[in-house]
Regions:
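Early extracytoplasmic/domain-onset interaction patches
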Residues: 31-63
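Bacterial N-terminal signal peptides
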Residues: 11-22
Length: 222
């Protein structure tokens, strides 16, 4: 059995009870899951109307997902239509304050995002799970730059925005601005000290995910 400390934040497999005691305490273990993210913005009439979000799960977690959902039992790295139909959208039943991690702004205004709908599920490379979901976007428009971040506030899942950044319907250049990791860990240490240290953080991990968040800025012509 492969064990991992799983949370229901992404409605993912629940092996935590079976694996208790095999993992370090929460502060030293965070994050548990690593996801490379990409975006496809849909622009109509100068405003963003939808966004497709790609999540590529790390190799270990992909293995856990495949075992838990019974995916690819023949090990050919290709999911059948039945496997996709039964599993598509598994990571969209969000809970515990997690709302998909995506935050978008135009200038100072935060854009409103609709509920997610699943688009695709596949295996890539040597068996990594990749999913895509789509969300409607309410964008007031204007000349402000569009920016996006993806992060888990509790830093259980570590997102990196290193996937493809595509804009459909406008000529835009995406710029990836990486998080300052040294500053982020300094902020994490300060936040943990403020609540009484690592022991207190085991059941009350501080919401520091934004400190570790990459940012993508979309500079669009016209």
């Amino acid at each position: 059995m492969v064990c991992s400390p799983i949370t229901s934040r992404l409605a993912l497999p629940t092996l935590v009870a079976l694996c208790a005691g095999l993992w370090p305490s929460a502060p030293s273990a965070h994050p548990h899951i690593f996801v490379d993210s990409g975006l496809r913005l849909v622009v109509e009439g100068g405003v963003v109307t939808a966004v497709e979000v790609t999540w590529l799960y790390d190799e270990l977690y992909s293995l856990i997902l495949m075992e838990d959902y019974g995916l690819d039992p023949d090990f050919d790295l290709v999911l059948t239509e039945e496997e996709v139909a039964q599993t598509l959208g598994f990571d969209l039943n969000w809970s515990h304050g997690f709302e998909g991690g995506l935050v978008m702004h135009r200038g100072e205004a935060e854009l409103t995002l609709g509920a997610p709908s699943p688009v695709s599920l596949e295996l890539v490379g040597e068996g990594q799970v990749r999913t895509v979901h789509r969300r409607a976007v309410t964008d007031p428009g204007g000349s402000g730059t569009v920016e996006a971040q993806i992060y888990d506030p509790e830093f259980y899942v570590a997102f990196e925005m290193i996937g493809e950044m595509i804009v459909e319907g406008a000529t835009c250049t995406p710029e990836l601005i990486r998080a300052d990791i040294d500053a982020a860990y300094a902020g994490l240490e300060a936040a943990m000290d403020a609540i009484g240290g690592a022991v207190a953080a085991e059941d009350n991990f501080p919401a520091v995910g934004d400190l570790f968040a990459d940012r993508v800025v979309f500079e669009c012509a016209g």
